[in-house]
Regions:
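His/Glu-rich zincin catalytic helix
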Residues: 1-81, 192-298, 416-426
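M16 family metallopeptidases and their MPP-like homologs
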Residues: 27, 34-48, 81-122, 156-178, ...
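A common structural junction motif
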Residues: 121-130, 221-229, 339-348
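Short secondary-structure capping/junction motifs at helix and strand boundaries
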Residues: 126-135, 150
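Short, low-order "capping/linker" segments at domain edges
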Residues: 145-150, 244-256, 360-376, 380
Length: 426
């Protein structure tokens, strides 16, 4: 078992790759009142087009299949659902699908070994029948229809549709109604057999645990299972243009107060994908659009917005920044956001203050087993090297104001997409 020292924080994460290929990460905290376990598959909604080792065929599956499989995987061969198993243990379980991966997780206070056994058993013991697929299809179709009436959901995906040409993040994680109708049991089996393999998965166990004993038990459970040869699926690479799809669109939705989004698409070569750059960019955005920013407080005091937020995402060859607001004055607020983007700034005092706050948040993160689990997942999925960022505290400590100013000068505003959602006309 390898020990990963989280430098400067006096924390340790234990790691081992099992013979099956499963990566296991464990973090102990005897002060925690509970444990959190996640079993994660490196398969998300964007991975619909792929090739298999030794197979010349290019596979292209319907959008939404990762989410469909996540739902379907809760069914048990003897009838019932995985929820029934965990209810007996008093354990909360759930799952989610993102663009990049699928996670099956649980939280509890007792019977850790039984919980681990049940989790590994139900995820690695698939039971797919045409009847179950069709039953689940009906449930997912209803979920998708509800999403069509959810303004936040519609607005979220519309931003990506207007920004991305080829990147599959411009498609709904759940898929369209037609996608859901077209997913077959053969599609489900193809994805499960090739992506739900220990070589393409990792497990994270955090909280009130004994790392050594937990690892031994996970090994024992995994050694009792048989897996086919891993075919190393290769997801098709795309070349995403730097331009946005639409520079402006106005739509209607079930909102009382209009929503606006100003979305900036920046080529990654302008801001190379490094942990340091991600932190610096977040610091700059917090300073200009965050909760304590002068710009946000000014808009709220003048009652121009009821809310203002920002987000940033790395997608294929580009960095996407969204500035979102709820406002009765959409055109005016879009104009003000554009003006602010053209005059981004950060003072040395504010930079140092936000740097200290971020370091404090990093320390407090290790008080919560679920937060630590989520943080490890994020590092494995989203970091450039797909591994735990063990020197994160050092990176924060060594950030300089001069680096922030340099990165600020590289933020390119050539490609902007504006989206406005106004209330439906009565």
């Amino acid at each position: 078992m390898e020990t990963i020292e989280i430098k400067g924080l006096k924390e340790k994460v234990y790691y081992e790759k099992l013979p099956s290929g499963l990566d296991v990460y464990l973090w102990e905290n005897e002060k925690s009142s509970s444990f959190f376990v996640s079993l994660n598959v490196k398969y998300g909604s964007i991975h619909t087009d792929f090739k298999l080792e030794g197979d010349k065929k290019n596979y292209s599956l319907p959008n939404g299949i990762a989410h469909f499989l996540e739902h379907l995987n809760f069914n048990l061969k003897g009838g019932g659902s995985a929820y029934d198993l965990f209810d007996k243990l008093g354990t909360d379980i759930n799952a989610f699908t993102t663009f990049e991966y699928t996670s099956y997780h649980l939280t509890g206070t007792n019977n850790l070994e039984e919980n681990i056994k049940y989790l590994l058993d139900y995820v690695f013991t698939p039971y797919f029948t045409k009847k179950l697929v069709n039953n689940e299809r009906g449930i997912i179709l209803e979920e998708a229809k509800m999403g069509l009436d959810n303004p936040g959901n519609v607005f979220f995906y519309k931003k990506y549709e207007n920004t991305l040409f080829k990147d599959k993040r411009n498609k709904k994680i759940i898929g369209s109604l037609d996608d859901i109708k077209n997913i077959s049991i053969d599609d489900i089996k193809l994805v499960y057999e090739n992506f739900y393999h220990p070589e393409n998965m990792f497990m994270v166990v955090t909280g009130n645990i004994d790392a050594y004993k937990s690892l031994l038990y996970i090994k024992e459970q995994m050694n009792s299972k048989e897996f086919k040869k891993y075919k190393h699926p290769q997801v098709m690479k795309i070349k995403e243009p730097n331009k946005v799809v639409k520079e402006f669109e106005e739509i209607e939705g079930n909102v009382e107060i209009p929503l606006v989004s100003v979305c900036i698409k920046i080529p990654k070569k302008k801001i190379p994908e490094k942990t340091k750059n991600n932190i610096l960019l977040s610091t700059i955005l917090k300073s200009n659009f965050g909760a304590s920013s002068e710009f946000k407080n000014d808009l709220i005091e003048k009652k121009l917005v009821t809310n203002l937020s920002f987000s940033r995402n790395i997608v294929t060859d580009n960095l996407i920044i969204n500035i979102d607001a709820s406002t009765k004055y959409p055109e005016e607020v879009v104009k003000l956001i554009r003006e602010k983007l053209n005059n981004l700034e950060i003072t040395k005092e504010d930079f140092e203050r936000k740097k200290r706050a971020s370091i404090a948040s990093l320390v407090f993160l290790y008080d919560d087993a679920e937060e630590v689990n989520a943080n490890i997942q994020d590092d494995i999925i989203y970091s450039k090297d797909h591994e735990i960022i063990s020197d994160i505290k050092d990176i924060y400590d060594n950030l300089t104001y001069e680096e922030a100013k340099e990165l600020l000068s590289n933020i390119c505003l050539d490609n902007i997409s504006v989206l406005i959602m106004k209330p439906k006309k009565k």
